[in-house]
Amino acid sequence: MSDLWIIILTALAGFLTGVMSGMFGIGGAVISTPAINWLGATPLAAVASTLPSIIPGATSGSLRYRREGLLNKRVILWTALSGVTASVSGALLSGKVPGDGHLLMLLTAGLVAFGAIQLGRKPASNEGVEELAAEGASDAGPHAGIEISAQLATAKPRTQWWRLMIIGIAAGGLSGLLGVGGGLIMVPLFTRWVRLPLKMALGSSLACAGILAIPGTITYAIIGQIDWLYALPLAIGIIPGAHVGSALAIKSPDRTLRLIVSSVLGVIAVAFAIGEIYAIIY
């Protein structure tokens, strides 16, 4: 395949990656990594070359969420603060993981599947109460407003620094080690454990994914594992894609978006698991 076709197809993969990134709050490496591997990049170069594209894509998408007031600065700060160190450590250890990373990817698939199931359940944040109000709480009787206010009071986001730092370490480690943006676990944890409304969880996760990709990108660039023939077209394609994806997410009804996000994460988890089991066996 000529370099021109590689550039065109990689840019297209970048656009699709961006749509998924913006809509689901993830780095999008689940599309870009296998895509550029199929186009000729080595497995290690495919992992390393996705990280540079996550940065502009996450920036494009998170700016769209910011316009709608859907970024939680405290969540982003503490999660990214701990995640940056973990991302560097993960990148440095990427070549030393037993089993070529397959066992770790299986564990990641299990975590994503669990997160998808949790995300698909009834909301654990204010989102659920807001949905109740939107669907006609006035029909529930004269005390409905009091009940909703009480639920809102008890469903405040849990943004303790230690809770966010644990999420950052896990997400950053995966970002550096496997070349994934970390959003695969941040979105479910932000919604279920931190109790952010879904759209705020998506926007905050996307912003964190971009920050966490920076140290990993620098580390991989220094050790010479990034193939810029793939990295640059990916970055060019992902920027408009992320803007489109984030706009679609923002305009979608919360309940519909929750079902879509949980379903997509579930499919990703199953695909990851099947692929890694196949790689281990064969």
Ranges and model annotations:
Residues 45, 199-203, 225-233:
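Loop-to-transmembrane helix entry
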Residues 31-33, 59-71, 174-175, 186-191, ...:
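Generic transmembrane alpha-helix signature in multi-pass membrane proteins
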